[in-house]
């Protein structure tokens, strides 16, 4: 029952649209809400507890005081509510986790020679902003791609000072040096326009333009410019290929879905422009326990698009959103054109939303694993493993194994080590497969296990190989586990504890047991095993890609007539890598000993 002061405040509430603030006994704002009719909305909280969710009951029990602000419309109330939630971050509101200062990309169009850089604040200063991005890693990656493609200046001066010679950025092909007149103002402005088109998702337009410029440069025998355009074209094609979606999509739209566990929801947003996925971001929402799916999506949409610089004409959501009409009006006003919000419940939109939702679930799982040590103690996870697997002691040392290859080529194996639940990267080991031909993962696992345990008693075993694990984890199911168990038995290690973790259903296989074990999705023990398994996969894949890149680099040079082993070594020594050779100018290639102008031209054309 509300206190007398609170009862009087409720009784005096107006029947206008507005925002209400609920405070506890300490005067802290614990909830902010909006309403078309303030009196009706606030009174709906003070009903018998049986008609409220447990979360709302807890909120009502803490309300000691009410404040309200009248607005001219429900749309104005929505904007005010957003600002108050962002400022006060009330405990009972659904809110973006760590939403203070999401990063943006800024293009300084107010400067003579515009720059592109990362910022955490927006100002009405004539600049163009893109974002927000969920984290600095994704925005840095985007900036790196832009830098490699368009080579804009990155010096901090608003006006680059005149220089007699270019700086290092020019020498390493990261800037076109406007400060020394290496590029005209019109060409530089054209370059920035291409970067904007790229960020808007109009890569096809940029591609057509670059192909035309490459052909024009080639026709006038300007091979250096033609090679630059060719490299840009190849990079953009690679980006476009990575933007294809399994679902058929058209036009411009954002697709939003989430996965929830308790009070935390992970929201995934796919940004689709011209039928291609140009980016995706994940955001954490707090305070979502017992909230309806439509309310969660509505709260996210309000908070995300409040700070977003790009609003598409269509937004597809996992469930029908609450307050759809008022949201559409507000978003249409912000965009300057009509915005439609629709739920992807059937057909092509459902296909798309299913993909987004699967990514949201994966992101939530990774967040759980990442936060394992802070949310539950590793001691509890190890103790649960001991019980679930029937071990005599908690597994103090866990070793994880995985294989990575493509149709048997560049095959490698990995071994990662976790002690007391924490990775020990100094003990990680990698294996290049030597005895197995073709795609035979079982035999590859046997080779890795034989090489690892064959060194246990050798003097040169080292600390990592000299110790036996408390538990071995194999990435795979019954077949992989049987291969490893057979190898261990041959090595006289019949008592070695070993399990397989199959990815599809996260089932745990044990030797001599026909049926797998299934632990709860939020089990600390399962989360620890997933972390070991995923780390083994990451480590193996990284080594595999490294070998593939090395083999790919040498074959690229081998295909150029006149470049034999000695010239290849000299080129690599001079420029550091094939990427460095590819970026080198015609003049610099011609200066390398043994490389005449004709051969330098062949290298530029064929590499």
Curated annotation (Swiss-Prot):
SUPFAM superfamilies per the UniProt record, alphabetical = C-terminal UvrC-binding domain of UvrB, GIY-YIG endonuclease, RuvA domain 2-like
Record keywords: Cytoplasm, DNA damage, DNA excision, DNA repair, Excision nuclease, SOS response
- Where does the UniProt annotation locate this protein? Cytoplasm
Q: What InterPro entries does the database record attribute to this sequence?
A: GIY-YIG_endonuc, GIY-YIG_endonuc_sf, GIY-YIG_UvrC_Cho, RuvA_2-like, UVR_dom, UVR_dom_sf, UvrABC_protein_C, UvrC
What is any one GO biological process for this UniProt entry? SOS response
**Similarity field:** Belongs to the UvrC family.
What quaternary arrangement does the UniProt entry report? Interacts with UvrB in an incision complex.
Recorded protein name is UvrABC system protein C
